[in-house]
Amino acid sequence: MDESRRQRPAGHVAANLSPQGARQRSFKDWLASYVHSNPHGASGRPSGPSLQDAAVSRSSHGSRHRSGLRERLRAGLSRWRMSRSSHRRASPETPGTAAKLNRPPLRRSQAALTAPPSSPSHILTLTRIRKLCSPVFAINPALHYTTLEIPGARSFGGSGGYGDVQLIREHKLAVKTIKEKEWFAVELIATLLVGECVLRAGRTHNIRGFIAPLGFSLQQRQIVFPAYDMDLGKYIGQLASLRTTNPSVSTALHQCFTELARAVVFLNTTCGISHLDIKCANILVMLRSDAVSLRRAVLADFSLVTLNSNSTIARGQFCLQEPDLKSPRMFGMPTALTTANFHTLVGHGYNQPPELLVKYLNNERAEFTNHRLKHDVGLAVDLYALGQTLLELVVSVYVAPSLGVPVTRFPGYQYFNNQLSPDFALALLAYRCVLHPALFVNSAETNTHGLAYDVPEGIRRHLRNPKIRRAFTDRCINYQHTHKAILSSVALPPELKPLLVLVSRLCHTNPCARHALS
């Protein structure tokens, strides 16, 4: 018989014995026996002499007796503690006497990230559906790490309103650290959702236009991504300084932005997720061997991601099994991901479509207050913003050098509070009515849903306030005086026409024309 598996009854006498055979006593039992065995009472009063002798003794030696009692109690308590600790230690010559814990250790060591992680095969797995439209997803535990211990030099990769990015170029990794704990949960869930959509889109539709995470740390509030060569803003500056006329550059641009447009449509329509923060700084690029042409471009930074009306997981939950916990850690769907926010939609105004700027000027915000974001709105906003980033490249790299004048995509910068103002919204709408007709392609391909560019009368017709209408008209007249003659002399090479057609469709004034890209 295997003696190691035998169990004693709960009331067995051996249950009160230590591994060394001595009976275990509580502190209360020990103190009682000590007091009874002491020749003096617990109060320090002698038991033998009379009350008069006791009074004399207290008056002459009370302090000595009290101090002596305290010392004996302190010494006895120390011996009792030592005996208790020795009882807990198993005898070295007795096999199998180590005390077994009835609970797991307080904390098991988790894995630190010491080597560059590989791309995961999956990020989320549907485990069950608790209620109608309340799925529970298990997060791939292989993505979780405690600390980042990958060797290599760190360099500054960028900073934003929600976090900072460090680059480990030796291993081609980018580590984003979120500043606030509350916002980290929002961005982590958004990143995991988009990452799972990216993996599925790559397998089923060969769409790879979004960056996918490689790992994350709850303790450090970090998310690890693959590093790219630079963002689109830096690439535009580099390309403008080269003044290249190589047709392969525009061809690669057209391919990459077409891929990005497909990714935006897939994310909004199939996954029910709108990015809402597409700009040059959030598009990462990788160059070919010539260090000029694009090899790949992906959308990054999911800080403002919002689930639109096509999503079926707005009430979803996420669980992560950690080594130091018996039950998995649960995450609910953050509210910031499920409700529309007009301030988020409008942003700074640089890349927002005209219909959204008109709603801002008319103060039409009811449809965006505590409501789900409509799919067609999210898709129209994302596609227009993508077209504006491509227009930024065309103006900076091709238009401005050909004119010899620093023409920009928008009329100017905001200096007050870095927020959209009615004055700047009017300036944007009026400036586009002059810039877009000079660059957009006017053809049957782009005019299926009407003119691709904005005209003053079309904007003016939708403005409700007469004062705002007059201000808009004045702005249009001013920009026609200052820019129309210059822009009329723009002459771009014919190999740029596919790129301009794509800009015209992405930034079409009619949202339905943008939806037609899907």
UniProtKB/Swiss-Prot annotation:
Changing T94A: In strain: Nonneuroinvasive mutant HF10. It is found in: Virion tegument; Host nucleus. Keywords: ATP-binding, Host nucleus, Host-virus interaction, Kinase, Nucleotide-binding, Serine/threonine-protein kinase, Transferase, Virion, Virion tegument. Disulfide bonds: none annotated. The active site is at D277 (proton acceptor). GO terms for biological process: symbiont-mediated suppression of host PKR/eIFalpha signaling. It catalyses: L-seryl-[protein] + ATP = O-phospho-L-seryl-[protein] + ADP + H(+); L-threonyl-[protein] + ATP = O-phospho-L-threonyl-[protein] + ADP + H(+). Its EC number is 2.7.11.1. SMART domains: S_TKc (SM00220). SUPFAM superfamilies: Protein kinase-like (PK-like). Autophosphorylated. Residues 151-518 form the Protein kinase domain. Residues 1-119 are annotated as: Disordered. It is an enzyme of class 2 (transferase). GO terms for cellular component: host cell nucleus; viral tegument. ATP binds at G157, G158, S159, G160, G161, Y162, G163, D164, V165, K176. GO terms for molecular function: ATP binding; protein serine kinase activity; protein serine/threonine kinase activity. Changing V35I: In strain: Nonneuroinvasive mutant HF10. The keyword Hydrolase does not apply. Multifunctional serine/threonine kinase that plays a role in several processes including egress of virus particles from the nucleus, modulation of the actin cytoskeleton and regulation of viral and cellular gene expression. Regulates the nuclear localization of viral envelopment factors UL34 and UL31, by phosphorylating the US3 kinase, indicating a role in nuclear egress. Disrupts host nuclear lamins, including LMNA and LMNB1. Phosphorylates the viral Fc receptor composed of glycoproteins E (gE) and I (gI). Displays a substrate specificity similar to host CDC2. Belongs to the protein kinase superfamily. Ser/Thr protein kinase family. This is Serine/threonine-protein kinase UL13. It comes from Human herpesvirus 1 (strain 17). The lineage of its organism: Viruses, Duplodnaviria, Heunggongvirae, Peploviricota, Herviviricetes.
